[in-house]
Design a protein with these regions (language model features):
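Domain-level signal for soluble alpha/beta catalytic cores
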Residues: 1-193
Length: 193
């Protein structure tokens, strides 16, 4: 997200003070460089702002390369407080190859999937954090790494509409291996909706 540039934590709240057009202008040269690589697709992740969703959806339309947009959520909304229904309205019918949810709790990912699955018209992906939370004041991870929460929730994530599942902050290779095992179990047992 744009917010990772200033480094003031705005990547988690979307309080950029920029318009959608200004965000598009900021993203454009970076996307042009990435679109001209051998990458199979483009992925913009941890997007906290409805204005950045608008800007990136518009900018991705300029390129032939498939693109996925992944948002960060809390309590059934984007981090800037915008509704997920508004996100779905922007991306529905767009050229995007998928819509993701990342850098959040597993519970928040499940809530977002349940809202977006019937509305977005796109394949969905979910890659939540390990279960710990970032304390901005103490500048450290706090709480328990709840591996079982993420790993054990794979069937729920699939049932909620996730077609691709992974992990974000503090997720280890061991978590990913366990997620892959759970996903394989879903394929064998039929965890679909």
């Amino acid at each position: 997200p744009y917010g990772a540039g200033p480094g003031q934590g705005t990547e988690y709240n979307g309080a950029y003070g920029l318009t959608s057009a200004e965000l598009a202008t900021w993203h454009r040269p970076r996307l042009e460089i990435l679109a001209n690589t051998h990458a199979d697709f483009l992925l913009a992740e941890t997007i906290p702002s409805i204005l950045e969703v608008e800007a990136l959806t518009s900018e991705f339309a300029r390129f032939e390369k498939p693109a996925i947009l992944s948002i960060t959520v809390a309590d059934g909304k984007l981090r800037d407080g915008s509704s997920l229904e508004d996100v779905a309205a922007i991306v529905r019918g767009s050229q995007l190859a998928g819509l993701g949810i990342n850098c959040c709790t597993t519970a928040d990912a499940l809530t977002a999937l349940r809202i977006l699955a019937p509305l977005s018209g796109l394949p969905l992906t979910a890659y939540p954090n390990s279960g710990e939370s970032w304390d901005r004041v103490a500048r450290q991870w706090v709480g328990n790494q709840d591996e079982l929460s993420l790993v054990d929730s794979v069937p729920q994530l699939v049932k909620a509409g996730a077609r691709f599942i992974g992990g974000c902050c503090r997720v280890t290779p061991q978590h990913i291996a366990a997620i892959a095992e759970q996903t394989q179990g879903c394929q064998n047992k039929g965890c679909q909706k």
